[in-house]
């Protein structure tokens, strides 16, 4: 309603929309109202779900022909945005029935990983804040209080993890000044091992 009141056009990055955890549901931005449908550029890609990031297979859905023409014009200025034959067939193949079955199984695995990591962190890493994600395979740890109490910086904490083979990511580019971003897209046994290493060697 606010967007409609001020005639705002929306660019919605919905690249994670396939990866929904537990019983949660994804609501496409374009589905919430007729105004949203006609004033949203929704962007998708198979790269997160099917690990196809290198193939330049992203795409957009635009119902408004005027906005679509504007986006097509801007996109055409760089040949990098053009699909190639390999990426086109990879995209088609990903969204066949087998791809849907793969995605269902993937979400079950990721849900188990996220639930385990969330419970483990809350049980073992006092003063580390974490929220159970509803989607994606990323987990964001807020280490503000932990770092303050232990007198170390987030850079030092991140280095500790890397030093014991837990490759995690600086959370600052994701609006978390003292955060660490963890990728949980891996076998469950490795999630267990990573948490065990963090308990023994990092959050000590």
Whereabouts are the PLM-identified features?
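PLP-dependent class I/II
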Residues: 1-204
């Amino acid at each position: 309603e606010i967007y409609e009141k001020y005639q705002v056009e929306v660019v919605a990055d919905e690249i994670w929309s396939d990866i929904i955890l537990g019983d949660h549901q994804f609501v496409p931005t374009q589905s919430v109202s007729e105004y949203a449908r006609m004033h949203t550029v929704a962007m998708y890609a198979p790269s997160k779900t099917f690990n196809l990031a290198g193939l330049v297979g992203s795409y957009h859905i635009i119902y408004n022909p005027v906005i679509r023409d504007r986006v097509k014009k801007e996109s055409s200025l760089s040949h990098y945005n053009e699909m190639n034959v390999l990426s086109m067939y990879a995209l088609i193949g990903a969204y066949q029935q087998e791809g849907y079955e793969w995605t269902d199984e993937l979400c079950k695995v990721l849900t188990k990983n996220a639930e385990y990591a969330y419970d483990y962190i809350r049980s073992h890493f006092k003063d580390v804040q974490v929220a159970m994600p509803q989607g994606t395979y990323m987990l964001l740890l807020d280490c503000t209080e932990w770092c303050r109490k232990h007198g170390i910086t987030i850079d030092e904490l991140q280095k500790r993890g890397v030093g014991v083979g837990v490759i995690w990511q600086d959370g600052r580019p994701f609006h978390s000044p003292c955060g660490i971003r963890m990728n949980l897209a891996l076998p469950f046994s490795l999630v267990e091992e990573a948490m065990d290493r963090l308990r023994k060697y990092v959050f000590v």
